[in-house]
Amino acid sequence: MWEITVVGEVRDYSRFLLFENMLKSNYDNDVIVAISLTKSSAKLSIAVKVKKLIHTIKRLVIELILKICKEEYFVENLQIDTDDKDMQYFIILTAVMSNLEDEIDYAMVKFKFAKMVYIRSLLRFRLSRLYFLWEKFAVYFNYNMSRGIGQEIYLNFLKFLASNSRNGKDIIYLEDIDNHMILKDKSKNVLVSIPKSDEISIVVNLIIFAPNKLIINCYGVLSDKIANLIKYLFDDRVSILI
């Protein structure tokens, strides 16, 4: 049995709860998860009973850690000149997801898993190169996007990302299944499942996968605001709207 305890701050507790729910939904019989909370810390303990799942769970743990630290960094360092809270969250989430898979690959090679991992110490002392990359992104963003021009420049920035992602897919299907929006590749393999209520994450994931053709099989499910945003970002790549 492989075990790990991830130690974070009290504010990480809600993220740990979401992570616990995800693991229980997908690996309930093969993974044991427990969360504890004190006045000064939150702890996420995981035990993997099936050997073939260890690599997968390690990647998920690294992804969780990187998302927490990366979001903190960009919230503090990106200069987003808009009062639109949705747009602020949208920009932050897109920045967090940008190059995330490459960063996970890097962390998996550089980091040797111990029984206990302290989230912010791991980034600061073991994976400090990632902070350098995030700083470069923030400097570029702040120089080019933070000049009081307004919302249009942010939309153009997102459109640029949607056209230039390194993870670009030929075809993405977007489907509505059991109160979740499912992204599938051209072979109909599930790439990601997102709660229908989290529409911003739906768009962010579409930007990250940057399909050459986007086939939407859930007409009327998305809000008008999000549907129009998808049409704007992907333009003529939205080839079928059923």
Where are these regions (language model features)?
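C-terminal structured domains
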Residues: 185-242
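Conserved mixed alpha/beta catalytic, RNA-binding, or beta-rich assembly cores of soluble enzyme
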Residues: 1-200, 204-206
